Amino acid sequence: MTQEKREQFDRIAPLIGRTPLLEIHYRFRGEARRLFAKMESYNLTGNIKDRVAFHILRKAYERGTIQPGDRIIEATSGNTGIAFSALGRYLGHDVIIYMPDWMSMERIRLMESYGAEVRLVSREEG
């Protein structure tokens, strides 16, 4: 991995993971209970898949299996594609997302807003 890419990963890393842990106190059938919830909505694109995409891309750069200018292609039904769209754009990659044509327009538009090309696939196409 080049020094420039290492610095890019270092700059964006604080926006992924390190999400707060919320402790909720409640009573169930008369007994005190505690519930812990990770606030993954604090991630870059608001979901846990940011961690997955970040780790995959960082490891791919470290191993040399992805280079600047390579295209990222992901098959997804939503959140992973959103994460790859955002991180791919940040790292300077073209991103193509294949997803089912019955997914919400909001997901499609969000990925496109990050610069991804979204290609819809019908049930028949698989």
What is the role of each PLM region?
Residues M1-G126:
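PLP-dependent amino-acid enzyme catalytic core
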